[in-house]
Amino acid sequence: MMRILLFILTNLSVMIIFGIILFITGIKSSSSFGLIIMSGVFGFGGSIISLLLSKYIAINSVNAKIIKNPKNDIENWLFNTIKLQSQKANIGTPDIAIYDAEDINAFATGPKKNSALIAVSTGLLNNMSKKEAEAVLAHEISHISNGDMITMTLIQGVVNTFVIFLSRVISKFIVNLFSTNKEDENSYESENSWSYFFISMALEVVFGILASIITFWFSRKREFYADAGSAEIVGKNNMIAALQKIKNTCEPNVGKELLAFCINGKKSFNEIFMSHPPIDKRIQALIQEKYMKK
């Protein structure tokens, strides 16, 4: 789940920064069409920036060490396993990194299939059998080969666009509703007021949280398909065994920004705010071969 939350938070931060820049510079949208265009540019802009910086953000958020020249048996095994699985998935071998954490986890990120990163926790390497670890790695390889990073970027871009557009339209309506200068209700002069600025920023945060429900729904679906992809590479019994091992371990100790791209996510008070389906549901889907290619 780490991956998606980092992605969402980065997007939200970029949108807020864009909003501050627009307010300071006094740039206004003189029409609804102009506002739609501006919302789309900044909405997708934030999403694309998040994607382009995803590897850098991921590496630094967990202090991961990229393996360029394997120095021991574990690193050699990890490097060779990911290289072999990448060939089976018809993608370029991603950069490989290890980060120090007790939890059993791994995540994949990157701007495109042939320029990706897979990071693995020391907890995974120390506590999983090779068959279980291979299943986890195949899960991350499937995320890359399925183009999940691009998919989530497009989804987030659309979500961002609606968040920006609605927050500004509603903010203008609220400001004009309480404005004493009714002659300017049809203009966008209200965009220069501090009240408009704070209301629009607050609405962006609120709508951003609500919109994350959509993002999380897509993320949960992608997890099912990544599990199925792993099962096709290493066998569903190995993937089920890996999930059962993960179920009995602690939650991932990583930044919120990367949670969605981990093999395991964090629990929430409600499933709609979870980037990963409950592990029991994932195991059941594998048993039924629900998301596997027929």
From Swiss-Prot:
Topology relative to the membrane: Multi-pass membrane protein
Compartment(s): Cell membrane
Cofactor binding note of this UniProt entry: Binds 1 zinc ion per subunit.
Gene3D superfamilies named in the record: Metalloproteases ('zincins'), catalytic domain
EC number per UniProt: 3.4.24.-
CDD domains in UniProt: M48B_HtpX_like (cd07335)
Domain of life the protein comes from: Bacteria
GO terms of molecular function: metalloendopeptidase activity; zinc ion binding
Record keywords, A-Z: Cell membrane, Hydrolase, Membrane, Metal-binding, Metalloprotease, Protease, Transmembrane, Transmembrane helix, Zinc
Positions that bind Zn(2+): 139, 143, 223
Assigned GO CC terms: plasma membrane
InterPro entries per record: HtpX_protease, Pept_M48_protease_HtpX, Peptidase_M48
Enzyme class: hydrolase
Transmembrane segments: 4-24, 33-53, 147-167, 197-217
Catalytic site positions: 140
Family statement: Belongs to the peptidase M48B family.
HAMAP family listed in its UniProt record: Pept_M48_protease_HtpX
Name under which the protein is recorded: Protease HtpX
Organism of derivation: Wigglesworthia glossinidia brevipalpis
